[in-house]
Amino acid sequence: MKSDADWDAVIVGAGTGGAAAAYGLCQRGMSVLLLDAGPRFDPVVDYPLTESNWDTRDFPEKAGSVGSVTFAPGQKLIGVEPLLVSGSKGLGLLVTSGTRWMEKYHHVRGIGGTTLHFTGESHRLHPDAMKMKSRFGVAADWPFDYAELEPFYMRAEELIGVAGPPFQGARWRSRGFPLPPHPLSYAARTLGRGAAALGLDWQANSRAALSLPWHGRPNCNYCGGCNMGCPRGDKGSADVTFVAAALATGRCIVRPNSPVLRIEAGIGDRVTAVLVGHPDGTIERIPSPHLILACGAVETPRLLLASDGLANESGEVGQNFMDTLEVIVGALHPDPQHGRRGLPDDAICWDFNAPDAIPGVIGGCRIFNASGENELRGLSGFALRAVSGWGRAHAQSVRRLWGHSLHVGAIGESLPNRNSRVDLDPDQHDQFGIPLSRISAWLDESDIGRLRFMAAKSRELLAASGAQEIFESYSSWDWFGATHVFGTCRMGADPTISVVNAAGRNHRWRNLWITDASVFPSSGGGEAPSLTIHALSLRTADKIGKDD
């Protein structure tokens, strides 16, 4: 291993993309310094599932694990959308202001990034979703096709230990998933009968959670705590997969709590260093022979813009921001469903995932058993959200109905528009004086049309499955929840309308690369993006340094 002052590449961000890039470079014999603004998490210590608030708390916070962002004013809500209004029977309407609620940016800073918090869905993109401009006239094409990415999907799935079914429609595979699919939960089987009645294909969701022991990690025990952190290491978060594998090579140094404030550029065509801030206010300069940015679609453009607009010759840094659309509908079933048993989000329908699968709009969606996304983990949340009233009658209703809930979710395509972007807040700064990211997120009419379809299909599936009373519904129409974000440093062949080329390298700076979802030209039809980010990062890591 080279000394701390001598490495081949510096990677900023130890989450989905940065971890995979580090592993890919180390596999090639290169030495890597992997920086992250956040802390390390210890699964045994930091992810307790036995505390009294286990069913109401979110992913645990540690010092430095939550970044700060600001939001532009929310979009005004126009018209009446009864299927899209967010709220519950117990708590009432979520939004009453008349404008879209910009709740938060769901992002974890730390070694492993937001994969520490994610449910663990592991999806490949629909091949047609990579050709949105040439085939459907919207968004932009990826500068390569699915066949180019497929070997890197395989490499990522193999390291993670993805468990999935033998067939996933248009997503052809050169070989099967590494592990067999997880058994479907009781609730998923109930929804499966409803799907069959509607003529829909309902199958096991492909998951980055082990169905069998894999590479020294244990199989999932179905505790249901994926979003609160996996204490066993069976969920395929980046810390226990790619970071661990990179460290095992002896060629990777990991430095948590190291926020990068600025990038220094040289006179020619290379960046030279990054500046890292320390809690005492001192600034450290770290040389970077190759610099890979993997901070995500919000923080990567912030870093570039805060570095005097580095890599923004096209004016596209921060533009084309996309946040996938989401609908979650909860209903009560006459029979107990034990909705929190089994693997969260364990079943899925891809029938409407192709870009032209939804009548009247371009851009697809997927429908799934939203047992994890609903965050209805225990009795406390159920009593608050599913049952109205007070006193003894309320308690009796909770006792009678607990365990009878079903949730169906839909996640759909987000198309870029010029009103959705990430820029620098002119007034708000972090402790080092760096402007915060400011998110502007806007829905156009096609997004709202897609949401209407998603909400209607979710309710249709619940009804076909025997559910009789809807008690809550949430949608992106009135609520920005940052489900998955993409697109602010788009890749493409034309340097006038993109930030990086097909390899992930910036058009202007030969040693500046990006390996996160900011490079996505399109979002896909509701696929979870982590596996595609892994694959892209492995592909980019294969190219770094080969033509210097």
Set out the residue ranges of the language-model regions.
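FAD cofactor-binding and catalytic pocket of flavoenzymes
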Residues: 85-114, 118, 142-146, 314-437, ...
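Glycine-rich loop(s) and the adjacent beta-strand/alpha-helix scaffold that form part
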Residues: 27, 31, 38-58, 249, ...
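Short phosphate-binding/catalytic loops that engage adenosine nucleotides
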Residues: 30, 200, 467
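N-terminal glycine-rich phosphate/pyrophosphate-binding loop and immediately adjacent elements
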Residues: 2-133, 138, 143-147, 151-154, ...
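Conserved redox-cofactor binding core of oxidoreductases
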Residues: 58-88, 92-104, 109, 119-124, ...
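A glycine-rich dinucleotide-binding beta-alpha-beta segment and adjacent secondary-structure elements
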Residues: 92, 204-211, 219-226, 256, ...
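A conserved FAD-binding loop/helix module that cradles the flavin
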Residues: 522-541
